[in-house]
Amino acid sequence: FGRVRVLYGARSPADRLFIDELESWKARDDVDLAVTVDYADGGWRGRVGFVTALLPHIRFDPDATLAMMCGPEAMMRAVASGLTGRGVPAGDVYLSMERNMKCGVGTCGHCQFGPVFVCKDGPVFTFAEIQELLAVREI
């Protein structure tokens, strides 16, 4: 890897996870960390807004970028669209999908996402693999 850029969003300052790890990443020379919260209280001194608002502020070479994300599906869809809109190939953008999994082998259908099963075909997919599925409201 060259530089690692972490865009981290949480609903509120109290909802942030891995605070010690975030602090250690912030101290590293090879990691750029940007943290934002959707809603802030009076003691918060950081950025306020959705994680997608961080995208225009980072510089990267689209052909040398690999993106990995987890979180709410709407956020991942928006960030993935923002990255591909800036030239990152959809096959280099990875999303960790979450579904209610029961059997874990694709039999029960609880985790079915269009034609794929998150339990056996994922849970990590490239944006290229599921971009069209993410646009369908019913799934």
In which residue ranges do the predicted regions lie?
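Non-heme iron-sulfur electron-transfer modules
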Residues: 114-139
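Short acidic, gly/pro-rich beta-turn/loop elements at beta-sheet edges
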Residues: 16, 105, 129
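FNR/FR-type flavoprotein reductase catalytic core
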Residues: 1-102
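Local cysteine-cluster metal-coordination motifs and their immediate loop/turn environment
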Residues: 73-75, 98-123
